[in-house]
Amino acid sequence: LDLQGDTGPYVQYTHARACSVLRKAKTPPTDVIDAGTLQLKAEYELVRMLEEFPDVLASVLNDYKPHILTQYLLKVSHKFNEFYHESPIIGAENADIAAARLLLCDCSRHVLHNGLKLLGLAAPQEM
C-alpha cells in the first residue's frame, strides 16, 4: 500500500489526514472567516485549487474523461499536504488564523470526499 506519490491510497490518506485534524480541533469549523487571514502561499494555492472543483466536474461530464478528476484529486492532495506541513492549524498564531485554516481543511476534506465517491472509491476517515 503506497501512501506516497500519485496513487489512490495517497488521496485516501490525505482525506483521512484532514479528518484527523478536524477530530483533534477543539471547535468545529466556522462558516464565516475573514479571507484576508490566510496569508501564506500554501494557503492561497490550496484555495485556488479548491475553487477549480466545479469546473473540473463540468469538464469530466462534458468530455467523458474521468482521468481529469483523478489528476485533479492528486493535485489537491499535494496542495493540502503542503498546506498541512507549512500552516499549523492546531496551535496557530491566533484564533482567527486557526479558524480560517480549519475551514480550509474542512473544505479540502469535502472536495476529496466528493471526488473519491464520484470515482467509486472509499473516503476513509482513518488509515
Model regions and ranges:
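Non-catalytic interaction-recognition regions
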Residues: 1-127
